[in-house]
A protein has these predicted regions:
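Positively charged n-region of N-terminal signal peptides that target proteins for export
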Residues: 1-4, 17-18
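Hydrophobic alpha-helical targeting segments used for export or membrane insertion
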Residues: 5-10
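C-terminal motif of bacterial Sec signal peptides marking the signal peptidase cleavage site
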Residues: 12-15
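Function-determining sites in protein domains
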Residues: 17-201
């Protein structure tokens, strides 16, 4: 009987530990993937090319109004073209088919745990552009990784359920290098844009 209790206790402890990962001091590590992943169909059809771009905080330098809307609120693509100065784009990465599949797999799965909450700020520096076989932009997803917020084309509206930390990791994996990860980086970006005349305050 004594051996039976020891065996049952061991099985119970092992099965409980199997369900979560712990760090060195035994505190559970929260993963970005939830237990119940909901997978959806991607709404854009006819995608020929997927492009990742990065730029300095668009809110600091984008002064172009579009249809009377201020840069913060305007549509970022109209008539299949960007409505902001595309010369400010610092990096462009065209995804291969394998990378496209990995990106779309992240986008179609509602994987983010509820504790990743958006902040009041919005300092976008990254965007996904979806193009058709005529190289026209048919959809976009712009986001601010540090503020946990995004702006999307209407055909992707409400589709963002992935964790920004996961998307950030994917951008880095695919070759995007421009990230502002702390206040020092932010200050350097601001001073650089000011020195180039993009900021007047």
């Amino acid at each position: 009987m004594k051996y039976l209790i020891i065996i049952l206790t061991s099985i119970l402890i092992f099965s409980c530990k199997n369900g979560e990962t712990q760090n060195e001091i035994g505190v559970p590590i929260v993963k970005s993937v939830s237990k119940g992943i909901v997978k959806r169909d991607f709404p854009l059809k006819g995608i020929s090319k997927v492009e990742l771009v990065s730029y300095y905080d668009r809110i600091l330098w984008d002064t172009l109004k579009h249809k009377g809307e201020r840069p913060f609120q305007k549509e970022l693509v109209d008539n299949f073209k960007l409505t902001f100065d595309s010369t400010m784009i610092q990096e462009r990465v065209i995804l291969n088919k394998k990378q496209e599949k990995e990106l779309l797999n992240l986008m179609v799965c509602d994987t983010c745990v509820s504790h990743e909450m958006s902040a009041a700020c919005y300092n976008p520096r990254h965007m996904i552009l979806f193009r058709d076989n005529k190289n026209r932009i048919i959809g976009y997803d712009e986001f601010c990784i540090s503020c946990i917020g995004s702006r999307s084309s209407t055909n992707l509206d409400g589709f963002q359920k992935y964790c920004y930390s996961d998307m950030s990791a994917l951008f880095k994996k695919f070759g995007i290098k421009y990230f502002v990860e702390d206040s020092k980086d932010e200050q350097e970006e601001y001073l650089f844009l000011k020195s180039k005349g993009y900021i007047n305050y």
